[in-house]
Design a protein with these regions (language model features):
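Structural motif
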Residues: 5-7, 140, 222
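Leloir-type glycosyltransferase catalytic cores
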Residues: 83-130, 257-316
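Short acidic-hydrophobic, aromatic-tinged amphipathic segments that line or gate anion-handling sites
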Residues: 55-60, 204-206, 261-267
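Donor-binding and catalytic core of enzymes assembling or modifying cell-surface/extracellular glycoconjugates
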Residues: 156-251
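Hydrophobic/aromatic beta-strand patches that form the interior of the parallel beta-sheet core
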Residues: 37, 57, 69-77, 184, ...
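A short, glycine/small-residue-rich beta-strand->loop->alpha-helix junction that serves as a flexible
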Residues: 9-21, 149-165
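N-terminal pre-catalytic "stem/leader" segment of glycosyltransferase-like enzymes
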Residues: 1-51
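Conserved nucleotide-diphosphate donor binding/catalytic pocket of glycan-assembly enzymes
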Residues: 34, 42-43, 48-157, 248-252, ...
Length: 316
């Protein structure tokens, strides 16, 4: 076995990065004397301020990183999607990272540490209060309806990955939620929700850094999300969440055993596992296409789940 320290290369979207944190925390605990590093190919946002990992983290464009550090290290690129336990629905994304990084099998992991600054928390609080002042509704919810694979073609919103809500359902659910909630929609798409059919004003903050979104999520009562980053932020911050899943399996991408996260599985019995980062599978993708489309009855199930979780986990 090599005595060289390791450099772990972490890539992918923000949700995937958050899911890597518990495994790296474990590695730090179990290798206290190793001067390992973490190289972030997708940004360092969710390592900033971390009490154990902050000083080990580098952007991959850091000046002279290779010649000053990496040339004397073993370079490791964990790929959780290629872990047997993951693609056979035996573990979560965080646990798959742990298997890749620590090789200890499937084990319980703690929540990832997400350290926000007082400025980020305060900005989130001020933003949420401003929304409440405009809507007159004290209950607050962040709604992230679209996953990373969403596309906008003209005025049509699609998601070939089968992770996102359908736009028509988004409008209907917002209208139902706005009867009691101030709704803050987390999306990068340039959508005018009033023009699309929302009866009341919808808060849609634009061009916010992802850590500022974390500050907002910390200050709302709860979130409603698809398979996307906000559910991982909510889990890290112990914030109640309703997670609606389609093409992806709850055990892989969400937290079905967490008491303040309610998982609603649109794809149960219908989805086929899509082996992303392993191979292309046209049949799986075609099968999962449109799997998140829902009728009004299902919309009502989602809205009822929001109210139930609010009453059980937020309202005191």
């Amino acid at each position: 076995m090599s005595s060289r320290p390791k450099a772990f290369f972490i890539n992918g979207g923000a949700g995937r990065v958050i899911c890597a944190v518990p495994a790296l925390e474990k590695y730090a605990e179990e290798h206290p004397d190793e001067k390992f590093l973490i190289v972030c190919e997708g940004g360092t946002d969710f390592f900033k301020g971390h009490p154990k990992l902050h000083n080990r983290v580098y952007d991959n464009w850091h000046k002279n990183l290779f010649h000053d550090k990496l040339v004397d290290m073993d370079l490791v690129t964990p790929e959780p999607y290629r872990v047997w336990e993951y693609f056979n629905q035996k573990c979560s994304l965080s646990q798959a990272f742990d298997i890749e990084i620590n090789n200890k099998g499937v084990r319980d992991l703690g929540r990832p540490t997400l350290k926000l600054t007082q400025d980020e928390i305060t900005n989130g609080k001020v933003g949420v209060k401003d929304v409440i002042a405009k809507t007159g509704k004290a209950k607050t919810i962040v709604f992230q309806p679209f996953g990373r694979g969403v596309q906008m073609k003209g005025d049509v919103v699609t998601d070939p990955s089968g992770r996102s809500f359908e736009l028509g359902n988004v409008i209907s659910i917002i209208n139902k939620l706005q009867k009691e909630f101030s709704v803050i929609v987390m999306t990068e798409l340039p959508l005018n929700f009033q023009t699309l059919g929302c009866k009341e004003q919808v808060a849609t903050p634009s061009n916010l850094p992802i850590r500022q979104w974390a500050g907002i999520i910390k200050n709302v009562d709860m979130i409603l999300t698809c398979d996307s980053v906000s559910q991982h932020i909510a889990y890290a911050l112990n914030k109640p969440a309703v997670s609606v899943l389609g093409s992806t399996f709850p055990v892989n991408v969400s937290y079905p055993t967490c008491e303040n996260i309610r998982v609603l599985d649109m794809g149960e019995g219908a989805r086929i596992y899509s082996p992303i980062r392993i191979t292309a599978d046209e049949y799986a993708d075609m099968n999962n296409d449109g799997i998140m489309a829902m009728n009004e009855k299902i919309e009502n199930v989602i809205v009822d789940a929001v109210h139930e979780l609010y009453n059980n986990c937020v309202k005191q």
